[in-house]
Amino acid sequence: MRPSEISNNPEVIRRLGVISINTAIEADIYGNVNSTHISGTKMMNGIGGSGDFTRNAYISIFTCPSVAKEGKISAIVPMVSHEDHSEHDVNIIITEQGVADLRGKSPVERAQAIIENCAHPDYKNILWDYVKCLPKDRLLIVFLP
């Protein structure tokens, strides 16, 4: 075992071409990921080294089930309740529904890939309803009451 000063060092991670796979509590249609807080306030676990690896990996992948609480809550949401990893660092999101490769995609294309490939079928229409409320040809964060 190496100390975290070496194993989590950004230069080492980049040089080795690490493919990082981490778990998410929820991911939003923009590609932002919450990996530490339930409902945005209740800490589930610490971020650990996932920030170092997500930011510096050759490919950063996040996995989660598409639903939580026995299907009562979608893990793919319009906006994460707490952001640990921004859309700029997340390359791929995987659920049991499928894979969304976000590399090189515009915000609109990212939302399409995440909703179509990762969201549970019971929640896809709700997510598309949210997207329809956004400005045409752009995907901006909109706070709906």
What are these regions (language model features)?
Residues M1-P145:
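Conserved phosphate- and dinucleotide-binding cores of soluble alpha/beta proteins
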